[in-house]
Amino acid sequence: MFSECAFLKKIDLSKFDTSQVVDMSRMFYECYELENLDLSNFDTSKVIDMSKMFAGCFALKKLDVSNFNTKNVEDMSSMFDGCCLMEELNLENFYTDKVTNMSYMFNGCQNLKKLNIIHFNSTNINKMDGIFEGCSKLTELKSSK
């Protein structure tokens, strides 16, 4: 939808209706200058694909996905790939029971220090290569068992 909007800096999506969306892949792909994004109002209950959703958002520092419902998502590959300025990411409400692909999910998040993935379930995942590749500053990881 906003894929390759390279000069997009700000966007208000508070009234955006996503209740029928099943594919959010590449939604903000390569939005190089986007710094803050509040998606707390997004209805993601029907979404199956979130691959590369924020990939290449090099300037993204703050991202609110606190109300995402990920119970039907199957693909999260490269979701945050290249979000190199993000220091903290709270995915506390992400449930990943149906996810099969998480490869390169956080690849290149070189400034990521805190990550909350407390409800991640890797039972059905068959691709997880490079998931934390390049996350050299990651010091706080909250995960399940």
PLM region descriptions:
Residues 1-2, 8:
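N-terminal segments that cap or nucleate solenoid repeat domains
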Residues 3, 29-31, 55-57, 82, ...:
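Predominantly recognizes leucine-rich repeat
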Residues 7-22, 33-48, 59-74, 84-100, ...:
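Structural signature of tandem-repeat unit edges
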Residues 22-26, 48-52, 74-78, 103-104, ...:
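Register-specific detector for alpha-helical tandem repeat solenoids, activating on a conserved position
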